[in-house]
Amino acid sequence: MNFLSPPPFLPETTGPEADARYKRLRAQVFTGAFIGYAAYYLVRKNFAMAIPMLSQFGIDKSELGIALGMNAVAYALRKFLMGSVSDRSDARKFLPLGLVLCSIAMACMAVPVTWLDLAHHPERKMLAIGIMAGLNFLVGWFGGMGWPPCGRVMTHWFSQNERGTMMSIWNCAH
């Protein structure tokens, strides 16, 4: 995964121009992390909004609990495991890559209902739930790629004295 390698270190610069550039870049980094993580939430939470509509195909909430549970398991595993990968990656590429993959997996969630034609073939319901569980696992897996790069850039771009304030503002992205 060479394309995810972090960029090379730049030589240190000083002076008023460097200070102005540093402040501007910090604002850009914070804004990118905030919007990026908010986008992860918008993508990941779509399935919950579709649950009431799935009842017309004979799928009830308890059956969909399997799919939702897979998301939680994958999200927890990925969040834990991807921290070490994220630490050795370029956050500018890692964060959007996860968001794109998460979005693709979520967009595919409509496939089981339409492709299996549950309206006319209710006997395919369990297969559809299984496919949704697998896709929701992928949504959780790729969705776990959001926090590690955000946490890392916050610690790199903000001092210990600023971090509490910036992280509490950033947490509004949830």
What is the role of each PLM region?
Residues 2-35, 39-42:
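Cytosolic juxtamembrane N-terminal segment immediately preceding the first transmembrane helix
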Residues 29-55, 59-61:
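Extracytoplasmic
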Residues 33-37, 41, 72, 132-140:
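Helical-face signature of the major facilitator-like transporter fold
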Residues 41, 45, 128, 140-148:
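Small-residue-rich segments within alpha-helical transmembrane domains of MFS-like 12-TM solute carriers
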Residues 100-125:
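C-terminal ends and interior cores of transmembrane alpha-helices
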Residues 135-173:
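Cytoplasmic helix-loop-helix junction between adjacent transmembrane helices
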